[in-house]
Amino acid sequence: MEFIQSEEMKRSEYFNIMIYAKPGAGKTTTIKYLEGKTLMLDCDGTSKVLSGLPDITIATLNPRNPVQDMADFYGYAKTHADEYDNVVIDNLSHYQKLWLMFNGRNTKSGQPELQHYGIFDTHLIDMISVFNNLANTNIVYTAWENTRQIQLESGQLYNQFLPDIREKVVNHVMGIVPVVARLIRNPETGQRGFLLTENNGNFAKNQLDNREFALQEDLFKIGDIDAKA
């Protein structure tokens, strides 16, 4: 165990970010705004939207062997960390489904059993933790969006958007990623941007700077903005 005085701590110049939205909203397209060289794992086959762009290396997850492919991708990313500025996993929602399907193939029913869900929860937390600890690398995760119902102390119920990750582990996952951003589109202007602060209808957080919203092309430009007078 290492001890350090808080005044000696320095804010990292690297970031870990999770972006989520409904399918087709532009999550994968956002990756083109990362600066530097990017290594990306395509879990859902949507990387074609990045065709022709420079400085992006894409590995494609084999849906028939997702567990080993994820382990191999981490091994490659760790070994070649000095060659890339960014590592992207696109997307966790589909990887979750592939993992459960893979582990259900050898059961009598051909479906994942109850124990597999708990094993996956542990696996996902461990996986994100080790990727977050890659040295000198920005890490970006994507996920589809889901909704959950929340009850206030007053008894009022409301629906909240959040990443489409298993309910029992999603809070933990969102807790260990400093930025969780929901991508939305303005229906009037067509402009896309990210919510970076939580409200009753959306889960979002930003522990890296004071921004509450960012245009799609500005998400990765980390830094405080001047407060309004």
Question: Which ranges hold each PLM region?
Answer:
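Conserved P-loop
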Residues: E2-I89, S93-L98
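Hydrophobic, Leu/Ile/Phe/Ala-enriched alpha-helical segments that form helix-helix packing faces
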Residues: A77, I128-N132, V177
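P-loop NTPase motor core
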Residues: N91-N171
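Phosphate-binding/switch region of NTP-binding enzymes
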Residues: I139-A214
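Conserved acidic residues
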Residues: T38, D85, T137-N138, P178
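Charged phosphate-binding loop/patch that engages nucleotide di/tri-phosphates or the phosphate backbone
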Residues: L208-A229
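Structured loop/turn residues at beta-strand edges in well-structured enzyme cores
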Residues: D82, L134-A135, G175
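Alpha-helix C-terminal capping segments
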Residues: T30-E35, F131-L134, I222-I225
